[in-house]
């Protein structure tokens, strides 16, 4: 997963995205295309018949390092305010919306900032997966704050 987005300072901006995984992990694929991916469900029933569910912690970091200071953080669930925080919009297909608010842009100022997305247990908020890198060169996902 790789996100490269731009928000305008002083405005609320929402972004929609989905989490996809490689469908066939048994075959070595050297060049992936869209048909090689399938949605990663954010809730469902596992092979043992147990329910699972994820919430998302969306963070904007001060630097592209694992121990970077967290500048902005939003916990995103199926019930959070889609206008101010973001929301899981289609859990079965791994789709969600995140928001960079006017207040977030005031905290961040202008520039590019790395993004970290954590899939956490929806009940305990314990980290299960962390998504930071993507793109063809495994770059940090990022948001750029601009002024118009």
Question: Which sequence ranges carry the predicted segments?
Answer:
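Contiguous segments within soluble domain cores/interaction surfaces
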Residues: 1-148
């Amino acid at each position: 997963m790789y996100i490269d987005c731009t928000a305008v300072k002083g405005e609320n901006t929402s972004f929609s995205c989905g989490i996809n995984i490689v469908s066939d992990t048994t075959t070595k694929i050297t060049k992936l295309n869209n048909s090689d991916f399938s949605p990663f469900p954010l809730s469902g029933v596992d092979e043992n018949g147990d329910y699972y569910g994820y919430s998302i912690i969306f963070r904007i970091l001060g630097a592209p390092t694992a121990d970077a200071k967290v500048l902005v953080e939003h916990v995103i669930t199926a019930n959070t305010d889609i206008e101010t925080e973001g929301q899981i919009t289609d859990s079965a297909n791994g789709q969600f919306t995140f928001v960079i608010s006017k207040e977030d842009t005031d905290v961040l100022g202008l520039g590019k900032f790395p993004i970290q997305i954590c899939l956490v247990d929806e009940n305990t908020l314990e980290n299960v997966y962390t998504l930071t890198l993507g793109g063809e060169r495994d770059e940090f996902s990022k948001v750029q704050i601009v002024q118009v």
